[in-house]
């Protein structure tokens, strides 16, 4: 019984990820197979596994998708809270891609809550981080 439960849990995580990956790739929280509410729930379920496996890029992309889903539902305060916690986590990890994705999430939230100047600042900061990383990689 324990083995089948473990296998089921692993299978459902893989199934969830396979459904979420196209949404992440195209940066859209819309799908006929997944509701925006499911994206939010699945992010919470998948986070520990992705952290354990050190799939940080996928984890932060999933968090960005979750923020987009919250924005789509009109939950701006939840979206900004999620984006800010995402930013704090990336900073604690010193993970520049996570920081840049967090700033994109913050910018998306500002843009959709009619504060475009704050959004632009977040986007600029994200681009600066990515540019700096690219320059260091190419040296």
Feature names for model-found ranges:
Residues 16-18, 57, 61, 101-102, ...:
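Residue register of alpha-helical TPR repeats
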Residues 44-51, 84-91, 124-135:
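Amphipathic alpha-helical segments of tetratricopeptide repeats
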């Amino acid at each position: 019984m324990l083995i089948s439960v473990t296998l089921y849990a692993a299978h459902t995580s893989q199934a969830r990820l396979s459904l979420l990956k196209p949404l992440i790739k195209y940066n859209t929280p819309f799908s006929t197979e997944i509701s925006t509410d499911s994206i939010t729930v699945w992010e919470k379920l998948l986070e520990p596994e992705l952290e354990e496996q050190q799939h940080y890029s996928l984890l932060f992309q999933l968090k960005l998708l979750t923020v987009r889903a919250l924005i789509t539902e009109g939950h701006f305060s939840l979206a900004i809270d999620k984006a800010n916690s995402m930013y704090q986590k990336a900073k604690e990890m010193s993970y520049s891609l996570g920081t840049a994705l967090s700033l994109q999430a913050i910018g998306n939230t500002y843009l959709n809550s009619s504060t475009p100047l704050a959004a632009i600042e977040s986007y600029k900061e994200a681009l600066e981080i990515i540019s700096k990383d690219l320059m260091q990689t190419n040296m």
